[in-house]
Design a protein with these regions (language model features):
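Extracellular beta-strand-rich solenoid/capping regions of secreted or surface-exposed proteins
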Residues: 9, 22-41, 50-94, 117-120
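Extracellular beta-strand solenoid repeats
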Residues: 14, 21, 35, 41-43, ...
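Active-site-proximal beta-strand/loop segments in catalytic clefts of secreted hydrolases
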Residues: 16-18, 45, 276
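Acidic, glycine- and Ser/Thr-rich low-complexity intrinsically disordered tracts
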Residues: 228-302
């Protein structure tokens, strides 16, 4: 923990397999946060044996943070705060999380969400790429939650999300009054059960210049897209939906209502997941697999 908080700018931490705890000050076996004050890279050496980091990150001065090929485990955290919490206003180049599993636990462990930006941070890029993210209930915050920040690009690519934000919004992006040119992209993601209590997948109020929603599978949710007139209608392409009763039903008139738009090109098919309860979203329906939707590793039925 002290090595990360005192890292030199641009330092790379290459981790061998094993467990690395960001121990709480109380020395009671729980884990806490580390403040990242300088730009760093944290990566696992072996793709087949990822190191486990127990704890969470507070971005407090770092202008570039890259996390690759690790497991981020919040099960021992002594607070319910987000996996990534931006603490300092100002310019930042990027937060990129790739090839990583992020897991909480029921009743704790990142219970407030995955990422929180409640300062006037102007960020070039926030990206989650090829990540499995699960068991983050979102009690006290939305899953991705930006209240005051701004990102030129916000990307979720080739990710699997399950057991997340059952009663909160999937992506919340308020107007931080910094800029309005964000391109928000959700591509090749498998999203199961998110925002299931009639919440929103896109609670976006900052006037994004473009929202791209492509090549995704969304299943088993009562969510709507948005009830906000400021949410720009996405560019939809090649998406599959199953057991999403409200998502593609427009309930909207005169700039208000319960659901502002739908995916006009939606395909409604059961992907026949192998074992969703255990996090195995292998597609058993050949017709769905051939569409190459969702996270790429689940295309087994093709």
């Amino acid at each position: 923990k002290s090595l990360l908080s005192k890292a030199t700018d641009g330092e790379v931490f290459a981790l061998m397999p094993g467990t690395y705890q960001l121990a709480a000050a109380e020395a009671d076996g729980t884990t806490s946060s580390v403040a990242l004050k300088t730009s760093i890279v944290i990566k696992g050496i072996y793709p087949t044996d990822k190191p486990v980091i127990q704890g969470r990150f507070e971005i407090n001065g770092a202008t570039s943070v890259e996390i690759d090929n690790v497991v981020l485990d919040g099960s021992l955290n002594n607070s319910s705060d987000q996996a990534f919490n931006f603490k300092k206003a100002g310019d930042m180049e990027k937060l990129v999380v790739s090839n990583t599993e992020i897991k909480g636990k029921e009743g704790g462990g990142f219970a407030k969400g995955i990422c929180y930006i409640n300062v006037a941070a102007k960020i070039g890029e926030v990206t989650f790429d090829n990540c499995d993210i699960h068991d983050i209930q979102c009690d006290g915050g939305d899953f991705f939650d930006s209240r005051k920040g701004y990102m030129s690009a916000l990307n979720f690519k080739n990710c699997t999300f399950y057991n997340v934000c059952a009663s909160r919004d999937f992506i919340r992006y308020d107007d931080g009054k910094i800029a309005k040119e964000t391109v928000l992209t959700v591509d090749h993601c498998t999203i199961d059960g998110a925002a299931n209590n009639k919440k929103r997948l896109l609670y976006v109020r900052n006037g994004c210049s473009k929202i791209v929603w492509s090549n995704n599978i969304v299943t088993n949710t009562k969510a709507v897209w948005t009830n906000q007139s400021k949410t720009k209608e996405p560019e939809f392409q090649n998406n599959v939906y199953f057991n999403c009763a409200s998502l593609n039903v427009v309930v909207w008139a005169d700039g208000k209502g319960d659901n502002a738009f739908k995916d006009p090109s939606a395909t409604e098919k059961d992907p026949k997941y192998k074992n969703a309860k255990k996090g195995d979203f292998t597609i058993g329906n050949e017709a769905v697999a051939k569409l190459k939707v969702g996270a790429e590793k689940w295309y087994a039925a093709e």
